[in-house]
Regions:
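Charge-rich, low-aromatic oligomerization/scaffolding segments with amphipathic character
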Residues: 219-220
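Conserved short beta-strand edge segments in small beta-sheet-based binding/regulatory domains
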Residues: 185-189, 228-242
Length: 247
């Protein structure tokens, strides 16, 4: 009884919008509603022709679609991805906002974009708001250089998987210690941390993030350390050089 449910998905948004705009034809576009290939194509065709008035969807409606008759776009929880523990979170948020906002006003009629955010003064949101690509790139590169993130330094993400949480954590901490002993001080070796998606498909996941400039040397030293450190049968290790995401 003390629990309060918050948040919403596309289905809840669809029903709420349909209730508020009773005369409008509302359609939802997400992975659950677009199980057939034809459903995706038919929905886009109906929306483009004006048979659908309001389209509610996930990121799948953000990219590469041209709707000349769209004059209003609303983005709910625009900063959701911004708070993920990933150095590219800001970049992805800026990219998504720019893409979604670009759906409005593509015809002769000017468009408007409404953005819902808990952190409206975030650089990603403010630069997207002002369509300032150059400004965003400059501040993002300054941040990356200050923190030794790509493209100024290389990053290597090591993920340790195990069905047994304690065994996986112990193996990760042992590997981290061996890496720190083997690598020169010029390479940064972060402490072991649970992955943001800590358990996936029955496997507990732990991360070790490394950063350095000489990627060939770093990769070789990681490989040599792993070769000298046998892992339990139920522990797997994955190495991702310059990972696209840290989840």
């Amino acid at each position: 009884e003390a629990l309060i449910y918050v948040g919403f998905g596309t289905e809840k948004v669809e029903s709420t919008v349909a209730h508020i705009f009773g005369d409008a034809v509302v359609k939802r576009m997400d992975a659950d509603s677009m199980t057939r290939k034809e459903a995706y194509r038919d929905t886009l065709r109906a929306f483009r022709s004006g048979k659908i008035d309001i389209l509610v969807g996930t990121q799948m409606i953000a990219k590469g679609l041209h709707f000349p008759n769209v004059t209003l776009v609303g983005i709910i929880n625009a900063d959701l991805a911004l708070h993920l523990p990933d150095f590219r979170a800001g970049e992805r948020t800026f990219q998504l906002l720019t893409q979604v906002a670009g759906r409005a006003g593509r015809g002769e009629t000017p468009g408007e974009v409404f953005v819902q955010s808990y952190t409206p003064f975030s650089p990603s949101i403010q630069f997207a708001r002002h369509h300032d690509f150059t400004g965003y790139v400059e501040q993002e590169l300054e941040f990356r250089e200050r923190c030794d993130f790509p493209p100024f330094k290389h990053a290597v993400l090591i993920t340790i998987h195990s069905a047994h949480q304690e065994r996986g954590k112990f193996s990760a901490e042992t590997l981290r210690r061996k890496l720190r002993e083997a690598l020169p001080e010029e390479f940064m070796v972060a402490e072991v941390a649970p992955a943001p998606l800590e358990k996936l498909q029955g496997q507990f996941r732990f991360h070790i993030l490394l950063r350095g400039g000489a990627i060939m040397r770093l990769s070789r030293l990681i490989r040599e350390t792993l070769d000298k450190l046998p892992m339990p049968e139920d522990v797997a290790v994955a190495v991702d050089v310059d990972p696209y995401q840290l989840l």
